[in-house]
Amino acid sequence: MSNNRRGRKNVEKKLIDSAAFLVGSVGPNQLTVRDIADHAGVNHAQIHHYFGGKKGLLIATYKQLAFTHVQQLERRKISPKNLGDEPLASITDDYFKAIIRAVLDGQMYLVRVQIDSNLSMSRTTLKQLAELKNAKKPTSEMKSAVAIAMVVEFGLSSMEQYIDEVLEMTANDKKVFMKYFFEARSLGFDKILK
């Protein structure tokens, strides 16, 4: 790989990493090209040069976040029969926060990046669930099971600190809460797979 190519990849990675870090805290609407460039330590003109502007960088960023999310969940063998023993948001928190911010900002094209790139774990899980039940297509119950898991995961990602603060959660409270969290997350799957 030439030095120019290596330099380009390095700058692109810095910009995507910076955008991924920042978008979860301020959202795509408030995030500026200068914020991203300053955080990455590069000239803001490079965003236009490499990505065609903020929108192109955000698309690349959401694709990378989705790819990392899928990779981490596949590594843990997450499936309808095995949702794991930790909140998924704790594995790829940047992904969850970025998706939440895109939805709140009304930027659904960023949410669609994972679907259009075939990197939606929710869609993959839904497909796996249908296959496990020998269904030609997912049923309303299957979609609901995945939706409940999504609501529980995204809810924890966005509300955990609030819950801890408002309810003054002790270590024991948190232990009981997490037990209920896992039961709620798997509720629909357990009903379908029994």
Task: Label the predicted regions.
Residues 88-124, 160-162:
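Amphipathic alpha-helical segments used for helix-helix packing
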Residues 60, 70-104:
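Hydrophobic alpha-helical connector segments
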Residues 69-75, 107-134, 140, 144, ...:
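Amphipathic alpha-helical packing segments from all-alpha helical-bundle domains
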Residues 14, 18-56, 60:
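Helix-turn-helix
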Residues 99-103, 146-153:
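Short alpha-helical scaffolding segments that buttress acidic/His motifs in well-ordered protein cores
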Residues 55, 59, 93, 97, ...:
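Non-catalytic, well-ordered alpha-helical scaffold segments
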